[in-house]
Amino acid sequence: MEEENATLLTEFVLTGFLYQPQWKIPLFLAFLVIYLITIMGNLGLIAVIWKDPHLHIPMYLLLGNLAFVDAWISSTVTPKMLNNFLAKSKMISLSECKIQFFSIAIGVTTECFLLATMAYDRYVAICKPLLYPAIMTNGLCIRLLILSYIAGILHALIHEGFLFRLTFCNSNIVHHIYCDTIPLSKISCTDSSINFLMVFIFSGSIQVFSIVTILISYTFVLFTVLEKKSDKGVRKAFSTCGAHLFSVCLYYGPLLLMYVGPASPQADGQNMVEPLFYTVIIPLLNPIIYSLRNKQVIVSFIKMLKRNVKVSY
């Protein structure tokens, strides 16, 4: 009888933000604009890198893939959020929930490894400039990209597997903006302590590994930059690395709070700021952060616009 009751709940309510009814339309329009800018910004960055052969080097291949993952994460979360602003029902089926979580888990994990790889790329470029073409080849870059996506899929499969063992019989209210393993584990009538443990072990390990890689890489970069006697070289190095460091700080802060800090059944799980930040705000900011501080991207973008204008006339 208990098992039958446990299988009854196959739909969930994503509460999302708690807001007054009069804020429904303004919030919908605000997030719609954010989403459109995010998609145009990231796809535009991908198009610029794709069209310009001069940008077919590791630094920009990594940047293009970061833009792809950001668009992926945003497109997994925002459309459902927009629908919930206008829909009378905020229901999502269990199968949709699992698919959404799986997609987000792949994107978030892949981005962690991409940011670490980008830090290593900058380390080699600045600390070993003469060896950079021999070390950081396009072939190595592509292999690192493939490994990042494979790691993202494997990590998502682990949590997805543990998610399948959960049953839901008491509550179907998910206090989150999307389906995630932590809020789902909190409402499960199955013992979910192993799910929280897996989040702490695997998500924590991935974040620690990527953060340590980034910190070590930029520590060497900092010492190398400080040894430079050329002011122009110092400015160029800080300009190149500053955007990446800023993006890293914005990305890992919410993730650490989300996946390492509250990994316990006692956490209330109702803070929407962290997931909103790394699924909506970061994908919006990344193309702006990287493009505005990168002269080559700006020049290539202007050239692409000029070519398109000539073709249209």
Curated annotation (Swiss-Prot):
The gene is OR5H15. Keywords: Cell membrane, Disulfide bond, G-protein coupled receptor, Glycoprotein, Membrane, Olfaction, Receptor, Sensory transduction, Transducer, Transmembrane, Transmembrane helix. Coiled coil: none annotated. This is Olfactory receptor 5H15. GO terms for cellular component: plasma membrane. Odorant receptor. Disulfide bonds join C97-C179. Its main location: membrane. Pfam families: 7tm_4 (PF13853). Glycans are attached at N5. It is a multi-pass membrane protein.
